[in-house]
Amino acid sequence: MDRSGTAVAILSITTPGFWFGERNEVRKVVRECNEYTAKLRSDHPGRFGSFASIPITDTEGALKEIEYALDTLKADGIGLYSDYGDIWLGDAKLAPVYEELNRLKAVVYVHPIEGNCCRNIVKDVADTVVEYGADTTRTIASLIFSGTTTRYPDTTWIFSHAGGMMPFVIERFVSGTEVEIVPGIVTKGQGSNPPQKVPKGALYELRKMYYDTAQATNPVAMRALRTVVPVSQIVYGTDYWYRSAAETSRGLTTNKVFNDEELRAINRGNAERILPRYRA
């Protein structure tokens, strides 16, 4: 961290996650991981934060862990995966958890994982190459089209990898949630979800969310993202150890997408607004 100029690192758990297995064992492993990251924070004051894990498909266990992680361990937020087997994040089963997170005005970070639907479907192509971006996009769509982000407006969402493929399918997000009036014709949302679930439209919901730069500093990806959302919604992320902070910083400074003021906001300022206790 010192070599790369990283002042604070926010820790979270990546694949394969915790959702599978016997309920009590899952709760135990989740608790151990959260307590480990809390110890890292206490051992290195001011250098580490954490997005705590929860067993989200176990409602009782999830609610207990939210209380423990945020109240006792003082975690900075909650870390989720883009799907849990065949459940994406807009699923109605998760409503009790979202009600509590919204009440707490929690920060929720989402990292992708491959869904049951889509493992090893293209020969010689690792799931991380295509499916992580696709699954991030699926779960963003699930949250918006289900009306979840509308019902729980006080939750702050952060998605990894520049939102996956979302910037490139933005036209479909918009046309699927907004009412377009053509002479004599009213076109409603293209999906099974009526526009009234998303009364302000998909673009409004997308622009409330935050997106990190992990493995997405390529100029094509960054230009696409900043076309959809303002720079204020982009935060620094590395995917360490899969990608180093040095590589990420080099990508951001050489892609010629952002000026110096915008880079300062991405590198620190925007995150400080979400997590004010780390303000310099």
Question: Which stretches of residues belong to each language-model region?
Answer:
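Mid-to-C-terminal alpha-helical segments outside catalytic/metal-binding sites
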Residues: 1-8, 35-42, 64-68, 76, ...
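Mid-domain alpha/beta scaffold segments of enzyme catalytic cores
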Residues: 1-84, 92-93
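Short catalytic/ligand-binding loop motif for oxyanion handling, primarily in non-cytosolic enzymes
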Residues: 10, 17-22, 59-62, 69, ...
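Short beta-strand segments
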Residues: 10-12, 53, 159-161, 210-213, ...
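Short glycine-enriched, charge-decorated loop/helix-capping segments at active-site entrances
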Residues: 23-27, 127, 251-254
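Residue-level preference for long, well-ordered alpha-helices that form the structural scaffold
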Residues: 26-33, 58, 90, 133, ...
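Short glycine-enriched loops at secondary-structure junctions
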Residues: 56, 112-116, 240-242
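Catalytic pocket-lining loop regions of alpha/beta-barrel enzymes
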Residues: 70-233
